[in-house]
Structures are given as structure tokens and as C-alpha cells.
Amino acid sequence: MAVNTVLVCETQVPLVRGGAELLVQQLVSELRARGVATDRVSLPFKWYPKDEILPHAAAWRLLDLSESNGRPIDLIVATKFPTYFARHPNKVCWLVHQHRAVYELCNTQYSDFGNEELDVALRDRVMALDESMLAECRGLYTISQTVSNRLQMYNGLASTPLYHPPLMARQLAHGEYGNYVLSVARLEKNKRVDLAVRAMAHLPSHLRLVVVGDGSFREFVEKAAEASGASDRITFAGAVSDDALVALYRDALCLVYVPYDEDYGLATLEAFLAQKPVITARDSGGTLEFVRDGDNGFVVEPDPVAVAGAVAKLDADRALTASLGAHGRDLARTITWDTVIDRLLSHG
């Protein structure tokens, strides 16, 4: 059966916009470009205090998305927890991530869940519900092998990774390898932008750092810049327009992107499409599916001295920088929307 109508389901955190929001925006646009009547379904999601989690999941379960105003909906695409709780006879999931605080982030500094009795009970309940709701899906896909590995490890569910290109894929281009390092990430604890900031204390004075992004940890990162002694060489650009970001990528030396256990890491592919090497960390998760140490970037310890050492190599050898950047570009150009759309629509 041909798929003519699709709803893409997303959670919304008001005033916050990141990779998941861009993914949904792109998916809707790509489906419409192929003649598929597509719309998005959004509900706010609040995960704090913890007793808000299950009611917000229940809100999605109350939704019957099989039709709208008498018009049949052929397919729904769920993305993040708890969008896959929605009801539809032809539901597929392209999973960005589950509620990570109860899974791989549990008992780490990035989660408010630990081994307390109430935490364990709620965690077990969320995991059981996830397994039940995801089992309803006619197709189970993820945005990366990293996310697929988590699904298999924690829920025993097999899935297929579907990689997608960044929003600005057609605009990103190389200009020159300038004397500034770029960081593009929300300023949140798990993004570890402070590693890039603290690395500046170990780099020569002709190199600068431009930090793109905003978030709840901005003050923390700014204090790290002050403590580094290199704050005069660090610019906090905040959230910037697409055109401004394209321009920053064009003439950067490289991208430093060292999050903790990232789901995907669109900034990696953005940098590659601008022929910029990427420096990431050995525990950065999804970025390691793209960054090949010594081939298109460097994989280092999550330590400012190690980050600085990788940047220094690129600064000292611009021919190496160009070679790594070209290899990254070639890899990024193999990732297209056609594969994603074909797989999702195969469940008509």
C-alpha cells in the first residue's frame, strides 16, 4: 500500500532546540518534497520531578492517530521517548533516544537516577513500558549504531541504524584553515564544552576558540574560560543563524566535539561537509561511528591536554589538516535522505 499521509511525532521542551528538533524538521520537509502529506505532532515533555515522567508518557498513550478529521493516516513515525506510546496500527520508530537517565546514564553524573528504591522501581517501570510500546512498532530504526546497541543491551530489541545528513548539507563548504577552533554544541553538562575551553590554556596564543551554542551550563563554561587564563582568545557566540554557522565552519581549523556518549552528533557531519577534521573523545558515543583516528580526525582521551595536543598537530601541519578534512568530506557525502525515506515508507 502506498503511503500518502504521515505524522511525525516529537516531544517538545519549550525554548530548547537541538539535534532532535532539527531531525524532525528535516524529516517532515523531505517527506513533503516527495509528495507525501506530512505533519508533526508535538507534546511538551517534562521529566522533573521524576513523578512527571509516567503522566507525560500516558498523555502520548491517549493519542489515537489513526485518522484526522475523517482522513486516514497511513503511517506515524515516532522519534524520542515517549512518542512511541502513541496508538496507530502502522507505527514505526526512528529512535533518537529513550529516556537516557534511566538507561546508560543511570548512576552517572549526568542522571538524577540512582540505586534508591523509588528510582529502581520507576526505572523498571519505564523500561518495561518501553519494551511493550516499541514491540508495537512495525519497523524499529535508530539514528545510529550507538542507539541500536543500547536498545539491544537494555531491552533485547534488534533495530537498524538509519543515518541522516545535517540540515545545512548543501550550504556547507570549505574556505580555508584559519586560526580558530570551533565548538558547536548546546552548553549542557554532557556536552563537555569545558574540555575545549580548558584546552586553550595549552595552545599557542595565535589560536582562538569560537563556542557556538547556549544552554543551562553556559555560566559554568564561561567560568572555565576565565579560569583557563585564555578567556581573551575565547568567544561565546551563543545561538547563531544558519548562515553564520556556515561561515564559521568555512574557515575553521577544526571542530572540537567531545560530548559524553552522544546519540549521533550532527556537528561531526557538518564539520566534515566543510572539510574540517573533527577531534572527539574515546567515550563520545555516536561520533565514533564517523571519526576515524588519524584518517579524518583524532580520537583522544576526554582531557583538555589531550584535546590541545590534537589541535596542535593540525595547527602545525596544515597539509595533514587538509588530508583529514577531505577524507571527512568524502564520508559525509555518502549519507543521504533517500535511504531514510525509502526504509520508513516501506512499511505502507
Predicted regions and their residues:
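Short alpha-helical donor nucleotide-sugar binding micro-motif in glycosyltransferases
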Residues: 239-240, 247-252
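Conserved acidic donor-binding segment of nucleotide-sugar-dependent glycosyltransferases
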Residues: 293-305, 313-318
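Membrane-proximal helix-turn-helix segments that form the acceptor-binding/catalytic region
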Residues: 111-112, 116-140
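Aromatic "clamp/platform" in nucleotide-sugar-dependent glycosyltransferases that forms part
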Residues: 260
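Conserved donor-binding/catalytic core segment of Leloir-type glycosyltransferases
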Residues: 172-191, 197-204, 210
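Nucleotide-activated donor-binding/catalytic signature segment of Leloir-type glycosyltransferases, i.e.
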Residues: 222-240
